């Protein structure tokens, strides 16, 4: 075992004592959240050393010591893979989680169960690190299900709210659909490869192995909220803001993308899977960007921006560039966590107001939050030399140089322009203009537990992209050899979106209210997908379920077959077989008519 492998194992093992302490002593002291935050900060600092050593040595390591189970055909062991993906992702995840933990000290200060909240966040992080470092498909599945169940517990944290419970159930149901694909791939590889080790799976795979790849794609679509399985992502905003920040930056939603990145050698020579991934990602990134344009909830705007960026990562995998997709995961984590934390700061200071139409003028009252929100939005839009630029620019350049994706490239460029548009709209409505919130609102952002994490992530949003791209292997960004007009494409579409948003804001600032267009309803109602899937189809199912028993059981069984039918048959049979009516008095009276007639005739 190499030195950096030992140090990485030590760093990750240090996350376990807080969990064990919480299990042994449930009645924890008030210092438990600070203890967890300090542990994660220390783990982040320790993890920098093995990551630096890995960059210098460029030597992958697999740790496999403990055998779980052995059958007649398969040996299942606990195995960790420390390669480029895991060694780069671990410090990023720890840094972002450290900032979110410190932010939670301020945001969740009045929550009576804050100790349990921090324990859940820590388990959430550990399950994601298990997923990232797993060198075994079953072990990866444990991390996969771990982030799923922890997201359910954290989204429904405020369990007294009906919307939070509904959102949590929605998240777990949509992820169960994706898990069907994962279990299908698990069973297929065990049947055909007799192993869950990625090395053996890749060695024995052929280009015709379509079934497990479709399973992986379905799993990634469910976990990373691609079109069709996306409604749980904006609904997850019902959870606390620190949960949204951790969920969208470095844990659950990128797990699906990471699954495809980890097993990209299986799909890189399969054109059908590449095409499906490319098309799914392109449609998702455009649909999410269109939906974000008309949202008024600040957290949902950021949530749809996450969905759009996940679609962009899928596009990158679809053009066979998994390393670029991973780079975008790492850069995206910094500014996305910061955007959610800035949103949480604004919401908390405005007494839980999330409608951007009721904000405005926050630039002067909340200067640090406003500055960080602007930097994060510009990084999201791909502004040059911010963190997001280093990955988005390379993705668009690579897509430009690919000759098989003109349709997907066009959609991706449109979505990139829309990203700039809704980011600018959020900045203008939230930070500029006249204040539209109650005048007695007490705004205060002087708490260090609020300022320090936002400052750290702001620095990350400024410089992390430069540091990561200049320290990955190869040690520097390759020289670009494409024409100038293609190189300027990313900047061009970003500028186009910015100008579009400014122009729309200027044109519509003093207009009278008109009835919205159908396109506005399409965007604002999320493409009518929730109404169709969550209202119309369940209503149709309930109506059908009601009518079938009513018609089949009540009407047919009761009226056509048994009691009423028997009585009808008896009445019909009695009428048919006899003319007797049972009228005894009438029968006796009929005997007197002939007698009376006879007497009359005689006389």
UniProtKB/Swiss-Prot annotation:
EC number, UniProt record: 7.1.1.2
Major localization class: mitochondrion
Main enzyme class: translocase
Cellular component, GO annotation: mitochondrial inner membrane; respiratory chain complex I
One Gene Ontology MF term: NADH dehydrogenase (ubiquinone) activity
Transmembrane segments: 4-24, 38-58, 87-107, 122-142, 144-160, 171-191, 211-233, 241-261, 272-292, 301-320, 325-347, 370-390, 405-422, 457-477, 482-502, 582-602
Membrane topology: Multi-pass membrane protein
Catalyzed reactions: a ubiquinone + NADH + 5 H(+)(in) = a ubiquinol + NAD(+) + 4 H(+)(out)
GO biological process: electron transport coupled proton transport; mitochondrial electron transport, NADH to ubiquinone; mitochondrial respiratory chain complex I assembly
Keyword set, alphabetical order: Electron transport, Membrane, Mitochondrion, Mitochondrion inner membrane, NAD, Respiratory chain, Translocase, Transmembrane, Transmembrane helix, Transport, Ubiquinone
Disulphide-bonded residues: none
Location in or out of the cell: Mitochondrion inner membrane
Function comment: Core subunit of the mitochondrial membrane respiratory chain NADH dehydrogenase (Complex I) which catalyzes electron transfer from NADH through the respiratory chain, using ubiquinone as an electron acceptor. Essential for the catalytic activity and assembly of complex I.
Subunit structure: Core subunit of respiratory chain NADH dehydrogenase (Complex I) which is composed of 45 different subunits.
Family: Belongs to the complex I subunit 5 family.
Record-given protein name: NADH-ubiquinone oxidoreductase chain 5
Upper classification of the organism: Eukaryota, Metazoa, Chordata, Craniata, Vertebrata
Underlying gene: MT-ND5
């Amino acid at each position: 075992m190499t030195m950096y492998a030992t140090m990485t194992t030590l760093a990750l093992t240090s996350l376990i004592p807080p969990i064990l302490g919480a299990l042994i002593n449930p009645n924890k002291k008030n210092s438990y959240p600070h203890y967890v935050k300090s542990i994660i900060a220390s783990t982040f600092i320790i993890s920098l050393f093995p990551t630096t050593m890995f960059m210098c040595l460029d030597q992958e390591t697999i740790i496999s010591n403990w055998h779980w189970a052995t059958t007649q055909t398969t040996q299942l062991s606990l195995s960790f893979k420390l390669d480029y993906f895991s060694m780069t992702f671990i410090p990023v995840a720890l840094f972002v989680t450290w900032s979110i933990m410190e932010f939670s000290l301020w945001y969740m200060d009045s929550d009576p169960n804050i100790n349990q909240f921090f324990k859940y966040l820590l388990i959430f992080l550990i399950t994601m690190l298990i997923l990232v470092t797993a060198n075994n498909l079953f072990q990866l599945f444990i991390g996969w299900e771990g982030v799923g169940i922890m997201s359910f517990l954290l989204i429904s944290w405020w369990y007294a709210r009906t919307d939070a419970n509904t959102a949590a159930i929605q998240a777990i149901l949509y992820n169960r659909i994706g898990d069907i694909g994962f279990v299908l791939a698990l069973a297929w590889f065990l049947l055909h490869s007799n192993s869950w080790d990625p090395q053996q799976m890749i060695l024995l795979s052929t280009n015709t192995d379509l079934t497990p790849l479709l399973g992986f794609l379905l799993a990634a679509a469910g976990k990373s909220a691609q079109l069709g399985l996306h409604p749980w992502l904006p609904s997850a905003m019902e959870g606390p803001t620190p949960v949204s920040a951790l969920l969208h930056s470095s844990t659950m939603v990128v797990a699906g993308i990471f699954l495809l990145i980890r097993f990209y050698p299986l799909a890189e020579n399969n054109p059908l899977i590449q095409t499906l991934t490319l098309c799914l990602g392109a449609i998702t990134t455009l649909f999410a960007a269109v939906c974000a344009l008309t949202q008024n909830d600040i957290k949902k705007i950021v949530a749809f921006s996450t969905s759009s960026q996940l679609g962009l990562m899928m596009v990158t995998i679809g053009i066979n560039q998994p390393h670029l997709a991973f780079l975008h995961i790492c850069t995206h984590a910094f500014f996305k966590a910061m955007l959610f934390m800035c949103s949480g700061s604004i919401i908390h200071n405005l007494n839980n107001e999330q409608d951007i139409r009721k904000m405005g003028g926050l630039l002067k009252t909340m200067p640090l939050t406003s500055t960080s929100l602007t930097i994060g939005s510009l990084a999201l839009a791909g502004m040059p030399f911010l963190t997001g630029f280093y990955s988005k620019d390379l993705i668009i350049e690579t897509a430009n140089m690919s000759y098989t994706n003109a349709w997907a490239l066009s959609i991706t460029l449109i979505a990139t322009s829309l990203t700039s548009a809704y980011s600018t709209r959020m900045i203008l409505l939230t930070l500029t203009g006249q204040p539209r919130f109650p005048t007695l609102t007490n705004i205060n952002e002087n708490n260090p537990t609020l300022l320090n994490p936002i400052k750290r992530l702001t620095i990350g949003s400024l410089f992390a992209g430069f540091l990561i791209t200049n320290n990955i292997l190869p040690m520097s960004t390759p020289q670009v050899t494409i024409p100038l007009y293609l190189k300027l494409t990313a900047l061009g579409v970003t500028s186009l979106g910015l100008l579009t948003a400014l122009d729309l804001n200027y044109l519509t600032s003093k207009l009278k209210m008109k009835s919205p267009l159908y396109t506005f309803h399409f965007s604002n109602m999320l493409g009518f997908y929730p109404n169709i899937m969550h209202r119309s189809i369940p209503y149709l199912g309930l109506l059908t379920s009601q009518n079938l028993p009513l018609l089949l059981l009540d009407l047919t069984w009761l009226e056509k077959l048994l009691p009423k039918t028997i009585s009808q048959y008896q009445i019909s049979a009695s009428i048919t077989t006899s003319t007797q009516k049972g009228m005894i008095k009438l029968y006796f009276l009929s005997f007197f008519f002939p007698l009376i007639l006879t007497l009359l005739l005689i006389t």
